[in-house]
């Protein structure tokens, strides 16, 4: 079938030019499944098309479009609509925000609207801009997706969209791959100068609750047995964490390591070398890191708040209320003392069944199959 007789689907991939992040994982996982459908032609657009080709491969039903405009606002307002017109696109898929000029059907995935339920964790101007641009984008779109039942419900509540299908994040196959734990721990120790460590991978911002871990780490005297390792980009200042950290004895500070932003390869190494993964976030639209840790066979404890309440049926006693410090300490101490009590292999099977890109792609494909040229 020739490409001009197929349904043409445009996918905005500008996030692939900005380094590793959750939205990139979502687009990559979703469309690696969807491009298997040869009845549709997919147009992936970004500044670095060589990077896109390395990720999605060369297929007859895939075209890579280069963004020659790097200004984000002009690109959204005019350049994307021009590309859509030029290539006769039937459906375009965006994340959070869509162009106001509309020349085809729009799909938008709004991953969360946490700034509405947890405004204290977001700058005021950012909240206002996000609210109005998300709301306008949702109204302009023919279908609005989200990534969890929790996020879907909040998009419905705050943006006034009656039906928000869920396209759940999947876990990349690389996390399920077998590996030698002793070897990974040795490599992590050599590369990062860390050993026998508790790990938290997440961006730095107040709602991520890093301060909860460091406080319990000190009060439970876990520094006598473990290092505490953080990894993630600094998004918003966490003054509560900084204030507490500065009060710690130097001997304890030496046991707290911040690796900062890591490449995917280094992140995977740090994860595989961990003794215990801890995820105390207060609010998430999905919350994928604890699932990735479980998939990698790492004993994991997690917050049970917001979207992470979906994990309770299989994580059970290894979850906690991130706003209840004593409850968190109890779960952390139990897991740190006996991480082998967490049945990682059983949990891994649950993750593989519940969170895979085939399920998410099926939801999007169902909508695409209703679209006529």
Specify the residue positions occupied by each region the protein language model found.
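Carbohydrate transferase catalytic cores enriched for Leloir-type hexosyltransferases
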Residues: 2-373
């Amino acid at each position: 079938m020739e490409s001009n007789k197929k349904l043409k689907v445009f996918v905005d991939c500008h996030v692939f030019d900005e380094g590793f992040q959750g939205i990139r994982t979502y687009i990559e996982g979703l469309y690696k499944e969807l491009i298997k459908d040869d009845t549709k032609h997919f147009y992936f657009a970004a500044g670095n098309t060589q990077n896109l080709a390395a990720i999605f491969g060369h297929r007859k039903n895939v075209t890579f479009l280069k963004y020659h405009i790097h200004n984000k606002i002009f690109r959204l307002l005019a350049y994307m609509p021009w590309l859509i017109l030029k290539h006769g696109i039937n459906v375009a898929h965006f994340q959070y925000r869509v162009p106001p000029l509309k020349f085809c059907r729009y799909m938008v995935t709004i991953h969360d609207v946490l700034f509405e339920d947890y405004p204290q964790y977001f700058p005021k101007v950012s909240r206002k801009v996000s609210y109005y641009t998300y709301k306008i984008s949702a109204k302009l779109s023919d279908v609005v997706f989200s990534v969890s039942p929790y996020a879907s419900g909040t998009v419905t509540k705050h943006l006034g969209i009656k039906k928000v299908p869920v396209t759940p994040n999947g876990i990349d196959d690389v996390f399920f791959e077998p590996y030698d734990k002793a070897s990974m721990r040795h490599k992590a120790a050599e590369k990062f100068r860390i050993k026998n460590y508790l790990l938290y991978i997440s961006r730095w911002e107040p709602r991520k609750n890093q301060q909860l871990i460091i406080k319990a780490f000190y009060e439970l005297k876990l520094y006598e047995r473990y290092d505490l390792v953080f990894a993630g980009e600094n998004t918003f200042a966490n003054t509560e964490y900084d204030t507490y950290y500065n009060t710690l004895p130097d001997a304890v500070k030496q046991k707290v390591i911040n690796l900062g932003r890591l490449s995917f390869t280094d992140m995977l190494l740090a994860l595989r070398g961990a003794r215990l993964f801890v995820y105390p976030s207060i609010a998430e639209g999905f919350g994928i890191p604890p699932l990735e840790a479980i998939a990698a066979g790492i004993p994991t404890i997690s917050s049970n708040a917001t979207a992470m309440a979906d994990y309770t049926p299989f994580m059970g006693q290894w979850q906690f209320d991130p706003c209840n410090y004593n409850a968190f300490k109890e779960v952390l101490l139990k897991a740190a003392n006996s991480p082998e009590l967490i049945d990682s292999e059983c949990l891994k099977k649950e993750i593989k069944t519940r969170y895979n890109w085939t399920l998410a792609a099926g939801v999007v494909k169902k909508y695409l199959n209703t679209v006529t040229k």
